[in-house]
Design a protein with these regions (language model features):
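Structural preference for solvent-exposed beta-strand-turn elements
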Residues: 1-159
């Protein structure tokens, strides 16, 4: 097995307003990044598709505070790699390959066993391009043959 990779530099805090379109991919990525910030992040005009709602639900299951209001979404995170779930949980990515792949990356430094599932279509997709590199960070995985969902990840606190 290869040596683990360690990320040393963290993103410095900033207080900026960033304007983007209500796009599914951007909305998912914003929510996941906001979950890693310390404090509140607010986005206006996020897309309210099933993939984005599944993302917000996954973050809630991980103990992140999420408020979805009529005009905005607010996420209150605890900082980098700081999820607040106390037990093993299952996260449902629905049909979102973006969510399924990116959430695995966030869970690498989480020390709880997390099961990621998806719908019938997503469960046919190959996750090897994510799992193989993430193993270098020290995470352990259990999955069906050919790197398919459901996937269990046990991360590592080595970060």
């Amino acid at each position: 097995m290869n040596d683990p990779i360690f990320v040393k530099n963290k993103i410095k805090p900033f207080n900026k307003i960033i304007s983007v379109t209500g796009d599914k991919s951007l909305s998912i990525r914003w929510a996941l990044l906001a979950s890693q910030a310390k404090g509140k992040s607010r986005a206006y005009n996020i897309l309210r598709s099933s993939d984005v709602i599944n993302t917000l639900n996954c973050l809630k299951r991980l103990g992140i505070k999420v408020k979805l209001k009529k005009k905005y979404c607010e996420i209150e995170g605890f900082g980098l790699n700081k999820f607040n779930n106390k037990k093993q949980i299952t996260l449902n990515a629905g049909n979102s390959g973006t969510l399924g792949r990116l959430i695995l990356g966030l869970l690498v430094c989480h020390d709880k066993k997390i099961r990621v599932v998806g719908d019938k279509s997503l469960s046919k997709r190959d996750f090897s391009r994510v799992i193989i590199p993430l193993k270098k960070f020290g995470a352990k995985f259990k999955y069906k043959k050919n790197y398919k969902l459901p996937i269990e990840i046990i991360g590592t606190r080595n970060h």
